[in-house]
Amino acid sequence: MSEVKQYEGREYDVIVVGAGHAGSEAALAAARMGNKTLLMTINLDMVAFMPCNPSIGGPAKGIVVREIDALGGEMGRNIDKTYVQMRMLNTGKGPAVRALRAQADKHAYHAEMKKTIEAEPNLTLRQGIVDDLIVEDGVCKGVITNTGARYQAKSVVLTLGTAARGKIIIGELQYSSGPNNSQAALELTKNLTEKYHFDLERFKTGTPPRVDGGTINYDETEEQPGDEVPNHFSFQTPDSKYIELKNQLSCWLTYTNEKTHEIIRENLDRAPMFSGMIEGVGPRYCPSIEDKIVRFADKSRHQLFLEPEGRKTDEWYVQGLSTSMPEEVQQQILHSIKGLEEAEMMRPGYAIEYDVVAPYQLKNTLETKLVKNLYTAGQTNGTSGYEEAAGQGLIAGINAGRRALGKEPLTLKRSDAYIGVMIDDLVTKGTKEPYRLLTSRAEYRLILRHDNADLRLTEVGHNLGLVSDEEYNAFLEKKQDIKDELQRLSEIRIKPSQVQKFLESKGSNGLKDGVLASEFLRRPEVNYSDLLKFIDAPEKDLDRRVIEQVEIETKYAGYIKKAQDRVDRLKRMEEKAIPDRIDYEAINGLATEGRQKLEKIRPTTIAQASRISGVTPADIAILSVYIQQGKIAKIAE
């Protein structure tokens, strides 16, 4: 085969490779900051496509979407335009774990995001496959496509997803493919490891079969409707845009059973996961149905949610039934389940293996340590999930854009955002399996709530140029309204006689002395609307999201203060920087494992070093003293 002749294409400030959820955010962020940006994708019909679950949000993930929105990203706005159902999860629990989840019209989501990208003045969308990078003296200067085009740029972002040497597996069948039977990118990650010496890993994920909604017996399943109370992901979407419950699409709940499990057990010898065909490591928190049956053999049933894929399709997603079993076995499994006895399978489930850049090779900015001006994001970094990908894509795009503009990078700390938690986990601890964000990963989750993402991050987004002045002024007004109402409640006193009957009706003890309105609101049986029965309403008609903040900040004030004190202590450690070129071999007293881990990950602060597995408190003490005593003469020249 003759070699493709190369030619010089246009020059850009930023090039983003891959237009999934990470790439879309990265390209929009870079372009909106004033950079001439090129977004390359294998297939223009796959921009921001949802090859797996047709949903956005959920525990921890929904908070990330709010954070993306507060920073000026697009995912929240896009799902607000294209959802078919909206639900707030964990409403019976505390505010730290509440999260919004939307059922998406996956085709509308893709089309709307593509339209947004095409309308962005500084952004060029182009179909093509990137095979290699242009690297000179360790600096990335652009990309080379399989058609021979050489595009020069000041910085490059790779968001390759599962297309990176992707391989689909269904039973005994396996073939090279990206997600949803799209084309795989075969050369780029091969060059990353062979030419640029990146350490790659092989991960696996999977997807369930899709069934024809017209063949589901819904009478045998349990309806899961959306919420009546308005909620959106974007802080800019008004309640008036909320879809009435009667116009939302329901999901439906069913279960596997002993017959299902028997079919799976009888065919385990044909399951690629157990036959040795699958080499990649799969996600712990989203196992295949065959893996569940083996790992949780004592369970008599597993939940399955039947989810619509959109308003203009009859395809339904069977959440919880991810599998790579042979096609005919998948049909048997489906027909053993209540409500799916006559279901027609429209697409079989499959497993897909793909390449991952081991994330210890990244900085907190998502720039690679091996090649300057090269950034990576999304599943390329070992994460799973659209939301995790979009969060990383936004940060990578911001930092690639700021590098092109000659500005300092943005880094989010663990105490700033779930996005900061995720990136710190990846670059500090690495991951040996597809990484999923969980509320339990965030030690400051009471501060990192879905309801206060704008209060945490809008200022940052505005400073970056991603949040408009109009949006910022609306945010400042909301912030002032919260402050004013909290102050007002701290100045109003309530007499015991005013609330005696109310407290008796709640089965609560009465007051002996008068209390401030803020103290009365702190009681668990009292909400803001109850409080207004005993005091004057504020002069201004407050938005419900202002009232929500007033309630949360009042009721959880003590816990929030304790969490903030811990954050302040962490910040002092974060301020203790570790010199870039420190020579860990020159530091006497470090344990062998600690020395090896510090050398491999090369943390930038004492706080980050303390979070590395295998680095002991004694190692941290020695390292701190070494830096404090100014023994930097031993830093490698």
From Swiss-Prot:
GO cellular component entries: cytosol
Superkingdom per UniProt: Bacteria
A biological-process GO annotation: tRNA methylation
Subcellular location: Cytoplasm
PROSITE patterns on file: GIDA_1, GIDA_2
Residues noted as binding FAD in the record, renumbered to the chain: 18-23
Any one GO molecular-function label of the UniProt entry: flavin adenine dinucleotide binding
SS bond partners: none
Pfam families from the UniProt entry: GIDA (PF01134), GIDA_C_1st (PF21680), SAM_GIDA_C (PF13932)
Keyword Plastid set for record: no
Signal peptide positions on this chain: none
Keyword Repeat belongs to the record: no
NCBIfam families in UniProt: mnmG_gidA (TIGR00136)
Protein name in UniProt: tRNA uridine 5-carboxymethylaminomethyl modification enzyme MnmG
Species name: Pediococcus pentosaceus (strain ATCC 25745 / CCUG 21536 / LMG 10740 / 183-1w)
